[in-house]
UniProtKB/Swiss-Prot annotation:
Name of the protein described by the UniProt record: Protein phosphatase 1 regulatory subunit 27
Species whose genome carries this gene: Mus musculus (Mouse)
Alphabetized UniProt keyword annotations: ANK repeat, Protein phosphatase inhibitor, Repeat
Subunit composition and interactions: Interacts with DYSF and PPP1CA.
InterPro entries in alphabetical order: Ankyrin_rpt, Ankyrin_rpt-contain_sf, PP1_regulatory_subunit_27
Superkingdom of the source species: Eukaryota
ANK repeat start-end pairs: 63-92, 96-125
Tagged with keyword Repeat: yes
SMART domains, A to Z: ANK
Main function: Inhibits phosphatase activity of protein phosphatase 1 (PP1) complexes.
GO terms, molecular function: phosphatase binding; protein phosphatase inhibitor activity
Record-linked Pfam families: Ank_2
Length: 154
């Protein structure tokens, strides 16, 4: 009977280091990666996550915001449009009752506000503090002031 020789895999120091690093790699949850892609405006990755059903657009994340709120907060109209195309709710409220329209008005994004209104966003939706989107507009945001002309603004 032939003798069997046990062969042990030998690793060079470089291979051992690579293997150790691979064992220590960090894996972030899909929702964390998804929100990061939204903040960076990486539409290709945002679309991939949605199409692969790796995330839910309705989830309120630990930040207190849903994906659409994050996109509005980043000021990226194209990302907002992409999320809406895939079913994001333009009426969804964050944990303090803010809608995406509240954020667009507060942060001075007239194009996003106009887009949301064109889809039927509620101009009269009050947040938990009783503020309407128009109450949050800085008077220096002339385009937004004009957009809400005729509604109550202090």
């Amino acid at each position: 009977m032939p003798s069997r020789t046990v062969r042990y895999a030998r690793y060079s120091p470089r291979q051992r280091r690579r293997r150790m690093l691979a064992d220590r790699s960090v894996r972030f949850p899909n929702d964390v990666l998804f929100l990061d892609h939204i903040r960076q405006g990486d539409l290709e990755q945002v679309g991939r996550f949605i199409r692969a059903r790796k995330v839910s657009l309705d989830t309120i994340h630990p930040s207190g915001l849903a994906a659409l709120h994050e996109a509005v907060l980043s000021g990226n109209l194209e990302c907002v449009k992409l999320l809406v195309k895939y079913g994001a709710d333009i009426h969804q409220r964050d944990e303090t009752g803010w809608t995406p329209l509240h954020i667009a008005c507060s942060d001075g994004y007239p194009d996003i506000a106009r887009y949301l209104i064109s889809l039927g966003a509620d101009r009269d939706a009050a947040n938990d503090d009783g503020d309407l989107p128009s109450d949050l507009i800085d008077p220096d945001f002339k385009d937004l002031v004009e957009l809400f002309k005729g509604t109550s603004m202090d």
